């Protein structure tokens, strides 16, 4: 077998149908679009139209709302923090805050602040500055001999300047 003799199996590649090329092609005249009217035109179609029946998106009740003042925190668990300390990406003697966590690659971005969660256990004595923490996380840090400082939340996103 030579490199120039390599080819696909017969029938592995199917030629596309060329539409609108005469009656003999089998896809001529209307080109598979049926009769005349809105659906025969390109780009025009009423989305969600059900032939006069009340559309599904109008039959269902409206629910909920989006709070524009909601703050989204990046969450980090204690076990993730301990893994970073073990891997020496974070210095346990320095103050751990959102900027240091992002710089170390533990978090991708800090969003509206960092929230500390209590999964896992901590072996190192840490000084942590976060925007929120659970009771169990604070207890675990203090049990290891460290301290947690809760920072004031960042300014609201919805306020006009």
Curated annotation (Swiss-Prot):
UniProt name for this protein: Large ribosomal subunit protein uL15
GO cellular component assignments: cytosolic large ribosomal subunit
Function of the molecule: Binds to the 23S rRNA.
Gene3D superfamilies hit by this protein: 3.100.10.10
Gene Ontology biological process terms in this record: translation
GO molecular function, one term: structural constituent of ribosome
PANTHER family to which the protein is assigned, alphabetical: 50S RIBOSOMAL PROTEIN L15 (PTHR12934), LARGE RIBOSOMAL SUBUNIT PROTEIN UL15M (PTHR12934:SF11)
UniProt xrefs under Pfam families: Ribosomal_L27A
Subunit-level organization: Part of the 50S ribosomal subunit.
Top-rank taxon, per record: Bacteria
Organism field: Rhodopseudomonas palustris (strain BisB5)
Compositionally biased intervals (Gly residues): 21-37
Keyword terms, alphabetized: Ribonucleoprotein, Ribosomal protein, RNA-binding, rRNA-binding
Region (Disordered): 1-43
PROSITE patterns, sorted: RIBOSOMAL_L15 (PS00475)
Record-stated family: Belongs to the universal ribosomal protein uL15 family.
């Amino acid at each position: 077998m030579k490199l120039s003799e390599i080819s696909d199996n017969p029938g592995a590649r199917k030629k596309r149908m060329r539409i609108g090329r005469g009656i003999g092609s089998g896809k001529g005249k209307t080109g598979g679009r049926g009769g005349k009217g809105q659906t025969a035109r390109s780009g025009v179609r009423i989305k969600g139209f059900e032939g006069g029946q009340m559309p599904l998106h109008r039959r269902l009740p409206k629910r909920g709302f989006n709070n524009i003042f909601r703050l989204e925190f990046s969450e980090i668990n204690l076990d993730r923090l301990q893994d970073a300390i073990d891997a020496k990406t974070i210095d346990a003697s320095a103050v751990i805050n959102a900027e240091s966590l992002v710089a170390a690659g533990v978090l991708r971005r800090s969003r509206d602040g960092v929230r500390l969660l209590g999964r896992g256990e901590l072996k190192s004595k840490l000084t942590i500055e976060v925007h929120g923490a659970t009771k169990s996380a604070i207890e675990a840090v203090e049990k290891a001999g460290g301290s947690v400082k809760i920072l004031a939340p960042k300014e609201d996103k919805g306020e006009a300047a």
